[in-house]
Amino acid sequence: MKLGAFSISLSVKDINASKQFYENLGFTVLAGSLDKNYLIMKNENSLIGLFQGMFDNNILTFNPGWDENGNNIESFNDIREIQEELKNKGIKIENEIDKTSSGPASFKITDPDGNVVLIDQHR
């Protein structure tokens, strides 16, 4: 199963303070907008997302079809294939995608310790 780029999505209280903190650690802004209350930041191959007011807890995020630079990769598993494989393994999908759809979509699963995992395909 190819899940694509991995990042941790952090729920932050003050996006400007968080941006400054992670810039001090060597991260640079890759995508997003302060006006929209989210930034994707990168340090070498590490990605973090800063999200203010969008969700309550931190989320592990995978982006099928993207590499860590947000570039499309040729060979990837479509999110609907990933969803079906996880369902067949008995993993509960919190917001199932219509398997007859195509293109961008997302769903969430929760690991045994309550950590939310977002599978978020943008293409």
Feature roles, as predicted:
Residues 1-19, 122-123:
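N-terminal beta-strand motif that seeds the catalytic metal site of vicinal oxygen chelate
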Residues 3, 36, 102-104:
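Loop/turn position at the start of each blade in beta-propeller repeats
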Residues 9, 28-35, 98:
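Conserved catalytic-core motifs of GNAT/GCN5-like acyltransferases
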Residues 13-16, 54-55, 64-116:
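Vicinal oxygen chelate
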Residues 20-24, 113:
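Structural preference for long, well-ordered alpha-helical segments within the folded cores
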Residues 23-30, 91:
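Conserved acetyl-CoA-binding loop of GNAT-fold acetyltransferases
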Residues 30-70, 116-121:
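Conserved short beta-strand elements that form part of the metal-binding/catalytic scaffold
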